[in-house]
Amino acid sequence: MELASKYNPADVEGKWYQYWLDNKLFSSKPDGREPYTVVIPPPNVTGVLHMGHMLNNTIQDILVRRARMEGKNACWVPGTDHASIATEAKVVNKLAGQGIKKTDLSRDEFLKHAWAWTEEHGGIILKQLRKLGASCDWDRTAFTMDEERSESVIKVFVDLYNKGLIYRGVRMVNWDPKALTALSDEEVIYKEEHSKLYYLRYKVEGDAEGRYAVVATTRPETIMGDTAMCINPNDPKNQWLKGKKVIVPLVNRIIPVIEDDYVDIEFGTGCLKVTPAHDVNDYMLGEKYNLPSIDIFNDNGTLSEAAGLYVGMDRFDVRKQIEQDLQAAGLLEKVEAYTNKVGFSERTNVAIEPKLSMQWFLKMQHFADMALPPVMNDELKFYPAKYKNTYKNWLENIKDWCISRQLWWGHRIPAYFLPEGGYVVAETAEEALKLAQEKTGNTNLKMEDLRQDDDCLDTWFSSWLWPISLFNGINNPNNEEINYYYPTSDLVTGPDIIFFWVARMIMAGYEYKGDMPFKNVYFTGIVRDKLGRKMSKSLGNSPDPLELIDKYGADGVRMGMMLAAPAGNDILFDDALCEQGRNFNNKIWNAFRLVKGWEVADIAQPEYARLATEWFESMLAKTAAEVADLFGKYRLSEALMAVYKLFWDEFSSWYLEMIKPAYGQPIDKATYEKTLGFFDNLLKLLHPFMPFITEELWQHIYDRKEGESLMVQQLNIPTACNEIIVKEFEVVKEVIGGIRTIRLQKNIAQKETLELQVVGVNPVATFNPVITKLCNLSSIEAVENKADGSGSFMVGTTEYAIPLGNLINTEEELAKLEADLKYQEGFLQSVLKKLSNEKFVSKAPANVIDMERKKQADAESKIASLKESIAALKK
C-alpha cells in the first residue's frame, strides 16, 4: 500500500472502522482471560451527540482500547435509555403539531406513536459514536425498554414490593405541571429567583380593637388552601395571638392559630400561614396537628374548584391578580423584594408544585446502609475522591424514592386494582388474576375485572439495573455472562447523575448480586467554552461534534478533548485544541514517511546511531512505565501528554535527528529495524487515544495479514530503563543547545565545522559521537584552559568553549560586545543609584529591595563576562 503524502482522516477513518467491524474485533465472549467490562451510560434514545457525550465516550474508548492491548477481554456494552419525560414530551409536541391531544388517544394508541417516534429517531446517537471511533460490542446493543430489560424491571418491582420495600401512599411530592407527573427529589433543581415577599393581613376573629396578624409569604396565591396560622410559643411579640382564630384574607375562612417551635421567630413577622396541601413543611405541621388539607391546584398548575376563587387561572397569573385584589381590600400591608430558592423540574424547567398525591415509593434506608460503606472504605473507588463526600452526604440524608410517574411511555407499574378496592402486584396479568382470586376468595374474577395502574416507573428505575440487566442477571441470575462480566470494571459518567444513577446502581448491585456493580467510577467534568461558560444551545457556544470530526478528524478531536480533560475538573474546550491534535497527526504522519523514505543498506552501525537507539530505548521504557502508572490513577490527560512529549520532543526532535543519514546516504539496517520497532511501540502507546492514524501507520510498518490489527496487539513494551543514560543525555541536550546558541549569536553557518573544548573532565564523553554529528564538530577535546577568543558557556559546573578564530569578524564582534558593555554599565549605575537612595531603601518592601540587589549582581556578572570576552578578542 502506498502512503499518501498528506494525512487525510476521511481516507482512513471509515476504512479502518469497517475493517474492525468486519473482523469482529469489538466483540467479546466469556473466555479464560481477565474480563474488562464497561457499560455505556445510556444516552436518551432520541438524543444526538453533544460535547458531553464526546468527552465521556472518548474516555471510555481510551480505557477499553488500552485494556484490550493489555490482554484483557474487553467488553464495552452500548445502549440507549427510553427517557420517559423527555421522549413523551417530544411525542406530545409532535402530535400537537398534527392537532392531536394526548387526551384524545387511548394508552395503546399513544404508545404506537411513541414507538414509531423512537424507531424513527432512536439509535442516531449510537451511529454517531462510531464516527468517534467507539469500539463498542454493537451486537450487544440494548434499550431500557427492550424485552429483556423490561422483564428485569418488572421482576425487580414485584420482588421489592414482596419484600415490603415498595409501598403506595399519599405523600407530598414534587409535581411538574408541564409534564403532568410527579418527580423524585433528585429531579428538582433549585435556582435563586428574584421574588417578592408579600405581607398579608389576617383579621383576628372577634378582636374588639380590629387588629390584624400579619403573615409574610412568597406565595399569596396559595391562601385559598390555608387551614391554620402558626406562631412560635417562645415568640414574645406574638403572645397575644395564642388561642385566637384569624380570618383568611379574601377567602374569609376562619382558621385556628396553632403553636410550634418549628416557626422561625426572625422570618417576616413570626407568623406562618399553614397550607398543608402545597408545602412540604406545612404538610408535616398538618399531620402533627390534624389540620384539613385543601388542594387548590389542578395538575396543570391552574386553580381548581376547591380554591373557590380564580378557578381555571394559571398560578402565576393568580399571583399578579391577587396582589391587586388584596391591595384593593386593604389586606396587603407591604411588598418587599426578596431573593429565594425555587425548585424547577430538571426536564421541563418549570417551577415545580409541592402537591399531595397518591404515588409509589421505594424505601431507601435499607439500600443506603448497603451502599455507603464500600465507597467510604475505597472498596469501590471514586476518581476524583472528592465526590465521596457528596455521595456520603446524600446517603446519610436519604428520603424514600418516588418511583411512579404519571406518564404512558415507560415501564407500566405491575399493580392491578380489584373491583372492591385494594390491589395485587404481579409480573404478568395472569399471575395478577390468580393472586386477585386468592386475595378476594372470588374464583369467578376475570381479567377484565382488574385494572392495571396507569402510571409508569421513573426512568431511573430501569437504568439502576443496567450493569446487571445487560447480562440478563435479573431474569437468569447465574448465567455464564453475568458470572464472567460482573462486577464491571470502570464506570465513566458525570457527577451530575451521582444520585440519579451511580448511587442507585450501587444499591441494586448489592441487593441483587451481593457485590458492587463496578470497581471504579471516573467522574468527568462539565464541558465549558474557553470563557468558562457551560455549553448550551441557547448560548450558541456548543460546537457540533460531527462538524469538528469532519474538520479535524476523529483523532484530532479526541486528542483535543483529552488535552483539556483532567479527571473530575471542568474542561475549557477550544477548537484550537483540536487543531493541536490535527497538527500532531501530521507530525506522526510526516515522521513515518521520513523513516520509510530512507534507503537501507547492509552496512556497519555508526556509534552515534548505537548510542541513540540505546538512549531512546530507555526513554521509551521510562515513558511506558509512567503511562501505565497514570492509567492506574485514571490521569488520562497526563498519560496522553507523556506520550505526546515522547513522540514530539524525544523521538522526532532528538532521536530521528541523531540517526538521520546524510543527504543521499543510506541508513544501516540495524538502526532502521530498531527505529521501526520504536515506531511500532509508539503507535501502541498512542493507539487508545488516536486509533485511526495509528492503525493506518501500523499496517504500513510491515506486511500484515488480513484480519491483523493494532487494536488487538499486546503492549509488551519493556519498562527497564537505564537512568544513567537518560540523565547523561539531558546534559548532552544542554551542551548541544549551548553550541547552537553560539552559532546563532556569532552567525556561524551550520556547514562550518567547529572545535569543542571541555575545560576539565568531560562528563558526557560517551556521547561525543552524537554531539559531533548534531553540531558538525571536527573535534572534542578536554583542556585545562580554553583558547583565547573562545565563545563559552556553562552546563552545570563544566565550562565548554568553542575557539572562534577566523570564524567571526573580530571588529564587528568587538563593536557588538562594547555596545553591550556600555548598556550594562549604564543599567548598573541606575540600579546603584536607587540602592544608594536612603528614602527608597527605608520605605520599599523587602522583596523589592531584594529584586534590585539581584539586578545589581546579574549586571556585575555580565559586565565581568563581557570584559573578559573583549580582552580575549583584543589579544
From Swiss-Prot:
Gene3D superfamilies: HUPs (3.40.50.620), Isoleucyl-tRNA Synthetase, Domain 1 (1.10.730.10), Valyl-tRNA synthetase, C-terminal domain (1.10.287.380), Valyl/Leucyl/Isoleucyl-tRNA synthetase, editing domain (3.90.740.10)
Reaction(s) catalysed (UniProt annotation): tRNA(Val) + L-valine + ATP = L-valyl-tRNA(Val) + AMP + diphosphate
Ligand binding (ATP): 537
Primary location recorded for the protein, binned into one broad class: cytoplasm
GO annotations of cellular component type: cytosol
EC number per UniProt: 6.1.1.9
Record-annotated disulphide pairs: none
Chain coiled-coil ranges: 805-875
Subcellular location: Cytoplasm
Molecular-function annotations in GO: aminoacyl-tRNA deacylase activity; ATP binding; valine-tRNA ligase activity
Locus of motif 'HIGH' region: 43-53
Motif 'KMSKS' region, residue numbers: 534-538
Source organism superkingdom: Bacteria
Pfam families with a match to the protein in the record: Anticodon_1, tRNA-synt_1, Val_tRNA-synt_C
PANTHER family documented for this protein: VALINE--TRNA LIGASE (PTHR11946:SF109), VALYL-TRNA SYNTHETASES (PTHR11946)
Function: Catalyzes the attachment of valine to tRNA(Val). As ValRS can inadvertently accommodate and process structurally similar amino acids such as threonine, to avoid such errors, it has a 'posttransfer' editing activity that hydrolyzes mischarged Thr-tRNA(Val) in a tRNA-dependent manner.
Family statement: Belongs to the class-I aminoacyl-tRNA synthetase family. ValS type 1 subfamily.
Quaternary structure, from the entry: Monomer.
Protein name in UniProt: Valine--tRNA ligase
Lineage of source species: Bacteria, Pseudomonadati, Bacteroidota, Bacteroidia, Bacteroidales
